[in-house]
Amino acid sequence: ISGLRTLPLERLAFQPGSDATFSRSTLRDEALVPFADIDGVEATPLGASFVNAASSAGGPSLDLALFGVEADSFLVTRDDARAALAGPPGLVLASELEDEGVEVGDRYTLGGSEVELPVLGFTYAGTYGHAPIGFVALDTWQRIQFGAGADGRFSAVALRGGDGAALDVAAEYAGVDLLTKSQAYAGSPGYSAETMTMSLIRTFLLVISALVVGAFFTVLTVQRTRQIGLLKAMGATNGYIARDSVGQMALLVAVASGVGVAGGALVVA
């Protein structure tokens, strides 16, 4: 979802019932009107689909998350990217594809269509659904996705600015589902399952750590049986012995946690 995260939008409007999934959402120009009429709101159509780009030179094909944007929209922040998308049709690809050997001028046929496009350049675009992102002009995306019968269709309305209450009213009037950017992450293929898996892993790690700490505390207490007996013989109260044991364990846990966090930070760095 890094590609969606880096786009300078705040909300997305989808077709009702699409569950934030671009491939299940189809909107038309009339969905833009209620948002465009709100002061301080920038609204622009966004097309998104997954395509296979076949190399015209017989090289390796590319699996892309293809985003169609209007060249003069707020989604395109770089002047050179605006100029590229406003010119003859072409692809602006994620920079990691350049590291894999893709070069400016390479030509690809997209999505089983007859649309062949040259690579115009590269930008940091990230990924969506584990596929590197490629940008094309919106009308080019519509031609790839729908052929000659695009009829102004796109996937979602990208929004920036405005008051939440006013946007909710506009969304109800337009008959669309309005989501924040973070809510839209759930529509990325595999995102919910992967998030759930990571949550389960974290839960298991916490449970295992609690069991390990408990086992260590038990072993430490057993090893101190004679010492505890001596303290009792010397008149130590049960409260003192409990505080002493728990204090030692807390100190050990704190030191071990600090070492673990420091080690993890070094690995991440």
Give the residues covered by each predicted segment.
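Alpha-helical membrane-embedding segments
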Residues: 38-45, 179, 257, 261-268
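Residues within alpha-helical transmembrane segments of multi-pass membrane proteins, especially transporters
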Residues: 1, 204, 211, 216-217, ...
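Hydrophobic, regular-secondary-structure patches
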Residues: 1-63
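Transmembrane alpha-helical interface segments in multi-pass membrane proteins
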Residues: 230-269
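Peri-transmembrane interface segments
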Residues: 172-213, 218-226, 230-231, 242, ...
